[in-house]
């Protein structure tokens, strides 16, 4: 595109003036000297990484994970921390609920000796700690568990029964304005865990909403709705949950996709089970009757035994994982089906009804 010579001269002058006043890089052409690829961190689930479209959660952005109680919200964030630590990244956990179990975190692969943890007294304190860690540029991933537990100072100092209308929403709105720019500059991923509440008097549509006002919905680049869809049983004993995650908002790739995986108690996401299922779906693993084979070699009779084989032979599991990522993320092929066809979507917030 050719620009008029006078306009080009005026543009050059104003750009020089802006850079002189605010520093180099304060304004630039979008395609100039910058990577268009978004750096991501794996969620610990291959199918969710694929559903997100970019291979994981984006650094430098705000992410919201919400769902009912015991749906796997904290487990998913601990899996993200474990994946980030394996890449040598520094992580922090702001435990506003005062409920983090370090033994469980360790079982999921989290290096608790190098995990920063804070249990703030008030919501303002939690968000100030977030801001300080972000501005330091030394922390790569920050988890806040949860928005519902970020209690304003005025509410803590007041009495039970006092009215504090909109205090938490105002606090979150101010924090979002302050944090968004700092997160981008320091390339820090900030994940908020949120709880679900019911709107009173809703006759039509979805009565569910999240706590903390609307600011987080708008500032979040990715919003994940996590639900437990069933139980995994070993004979009579329940050993885990069937889990479904919907990507209800996504600013880095196509939204409204969903992923299904298993969360095993005391172990976390069942990665080998995912590899077997996706491997069969995309013809990397052959299934003949109950037997599973990889490159002509039998790896197990039944899904559980095939998964056990991949646990015992991690190099083969890693090979299948890399092949699936190259196929599904490199080629842009999505494993998860779009949810837009059979569900209503709130275009303002990206929520699926």
Curated annotation (Swiss-Prot):
HAMAP family: RecA. Keywords: ATP-binding, Cytoplasm, DNA damage, DNA recombination, DNA repair, DNA-binding, Nucleotide-binding, SOS response. This is Protein RecA. The gene is recA. It comes from Shewanella loihica (strain ATCC BAA-1088 / PV-4). GO terms for molecular function: ATP binding; ATP hydrolysis activity; ATP-dependent DNA damage sensor activity; damaged DNA binding; single-stranded DNA binding. SUPFAM superfamilies: P-loop containing nucleoside triphosphate hydrolases, RecA protein, C-terminal domain. SMART domains: AAA. GO terms for biological process: DNA recombination; DNA repair; SOS response. PANTHER family: MITOCHONDRIAL DNA REPAIR PROTEIN RECA HOMOLOG-RELATED (PTHR45900:SF1), RECA (PTHR45900). PROSITE patterns: RECA_1, RECA_2, RECA_3. Its main location: cytoplasm. ATP binds at residues 67-74. It is found in: Cytoplasm. InterPro entries: AAA+_ATPase (IPR003593), DNA_recomb/repair_RecA (IPR013765), DNA_recomb/repair_RecA_CS (IPR020584), P-loop_NTPase (IPR027417), RecA-like_C (IPR049261), RecA-like_N (IPR049428), RecA_ATP-bd (IPR020588), RecA_C_sf (IPR023400). Can catalyze the hydrolysis of ATP in the presence of single-stranded DNA, the ATP-dependent uptake of single-stranded DNA by duplex DNA, and the ATP-dependent hybridization of homologous single-stranded DNAs. It interacts with LexA causing its activation and leading to its autocatalytic cleavage. It comes from the Bacteria. One of its GO terms (cellular component) is cytosol. Pfam families: RecA, RecA_C.
